[in-house]
């Protein structure tokens, strides 16, 4: 069934869970308003960044749209008079930067369509509700028994997954929910295997899996129909929310924070672990556990959205577990996500940050033990326990489950192999992303350490020591040159600089072989040496080049005339008479 066009070849499927960061680089004042130039970056790569230009009115419009979340966001107030003043603009820029920091670090806000469109209009300009409605309408042309009642706008967190309330024409009182989603970045199944597996989902029967009434797919999207549940999901129970309300309204800022009772935590936790173990044993990748993907049917939890991994959609908690290199399989991802879910069931809210350093008081220490094994620093660093290990822990081991429904989910061998290969590809991309994040964190830490106050002080001390050492060497060199100059001036032409190992140059006069007389005391201003001292000066230069300054200075100070050998000359200047 071709109810949606196939995406063009080479289309890049974005991972919507990769965080966006935003920094205001500059502001520019025009005639009546100020524009702020913002650098937006996707993930850790500086190359994957772009500039956007926004006015204060754009921020104000975004902030009004986000009011549904019930949060008090720090948008700087409006100012009608004096809003073009330079100091005011600089102060407002700081306030807007703080506002951007808040909305990009809030896990729910940062993933919502409003914020994505504000920061990345090129990739999020499409109206996905309209697109989904068009494709669903095309689908109904060949399946006339279904009818759309109304769109369930923004009830989920995914930007590219839309929901519609449905009914069957011959059963008008019965309500169903249709979900439509396009492909994600982790879709590695072939088109044929993908469509076969999607159509296989209605045959999956398990007491803790919410049944799929109808499912179909083509090369680029999938459409599934399930029964509508008035009670909603486990997250709706925890937050006391209405299932049809928008995601931001339901979960961003709950009015009352209260966890579940201990028996509920034990029972729901055991049921969820049992269905995860069932999927793992079947070789079916999941990786999408969170409280909104668990439907409540009486006192029974039933898992939703098995199609997500087939579509290649990224996990709700991906930005958390991508930070930890030991959480690198879909099984360990499910265990880590179970830790998040257990925390929400226990405390009525998600953890402020992960890993969790210390846990608040819980209804039982057995709860804390499971939380520590999945969310603590040690667990995130060393790795997750298995599902079987969690089932053996005291919190769940004594829970008795009573169900008469026998699990059924037959996957052909060929499709099992396709699932195995797809699972390996999903894990490979995760490992590569974790590696890049780890390298980036190390580099950032090194740069931060290099620029820290302590490091700057160390570098100043080293520079000071180097400067002192250089000054001392220059002083010694100057002293050696000064002594050299004094000795040369005092000895005149008849006393060249020598060392014990230096040969004595022969006399150029050719008259006397006697040693030179003692030099007179040096005058205040010594005259320049005559031309006859060129040979000693050259020898002195060679001596300086051949030995250290200290040895030369010592040689000069210890010089004794008595050590000079007498020179013998033969006078051949007299005329010969033959």
From Swiss-Prot:
Residues 568-578 have a biased composition (Basic and acidic residues). It comes from the Eukaryota. Widely expressed in all tissues examined except in heart. Isoform 1 is expressed in high levels in the brain, skeletal muscle, spleen and testis. Isoform 7 expression has yet to be demonstrated. Its main location: cytoplasm. Residues 483-513 have a biased composition (Low complexity). Residues 548-567 form the WH2 domain. GO terms for biological process: inflammatory response; modulation of chemical synaptic transmission; negative regulation of ATP-dependent activity; negative regulation of monoatomic ion transport. Residues 88-481 form the Protein kinase domain. PROSITE patterns: PROTEIN_KINASE_DOM, PX, WH2. The keyword Hydrolase does not apply. InterPro entries: Kinase-like_dom_sf (IPR011009), MONaKA_PX (IPR037903), Prot_kinase_dom (IPR000719), PX_dom (IPR001683), PX_dom_sf (IPR036871), SortingNexin/PXDomain-PKLike (IPR051837), WH2_dom (IPR003124). Residues 14-126 form the PX domain. This is PX domain-containing protein kinase-like protein.
